[in-house]
Amino acid sequence: IGFFNYRGNFHMSNYAKEERLTGGNVSSVYRSENTVRRELKPGSEKIHKLLQHLENKGFHYAPKFLGVDEEDREVLSFIEGEAGNYPLKEYMRSNDVLKEIAKMLRLYHDAVSDFPLLADWKPMDHTPNNIEVLCHNDFAIYNIIFNNEKPVGIIDFDVAAPGPSLWDIAYTLYTC
């Protein structure tokens, strides 16, 4: 299907038909077979390191960073399912789903507890000073992927930044 060149870039041997995915408020997001393609942004390299760290820690809820394609787009693994887009389906608002989302967030915080925070990775505006972890900062229902009525993934790490774990917890409760 594809291969990595000597620079670690991902190349497709045959262009697969791409499907534009819904969402992607900041950039266009495309699916090509079992991958997602998104344009690179300032800070993408940091997010790629984060995704690699999560994979190494066994956090299977995040997409895997696979490389950069010939069009300078990041290539991520596709998480099968549907995003929690509005209007929410009834099951997405259940107590059981909220408990599973809370577990997923806890596992994320555990996985990033030893992630090295680079000096140039600044907290978001108005973040409280007690930095504990690399917060996702958008752990919201619309970034959670559901399959068989269960949360199976979290996407969109673009605004991840250092902060207190309670910052992520409060935002998740507010948006879920």
Language-model features, listed with the residues they occupy:
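Active-site Asp-x-Gly
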Residues: 150-176
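Conserved structural core of kinase catalytic domains
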Residues: 67-101
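Active-site beta-strand-loop-beta-strand hairpin of nuclease catalytic cores
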Residues: 31-34, 146-152
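ATP-binding glycine-rich loop module of kinase domains
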Residues: 16-52, 86-87
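Conserved HxN/HPN-centered segment at the entrance to the catalytic loop
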Residues: 57-67
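Conserved kinase catalytic-core helix
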Residues: 87-120, 132-137, 142, 146-147
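Short, Lys/Arg-enriched N-terminal segments with co-localized hydrophobic residues
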Residues: 1-11
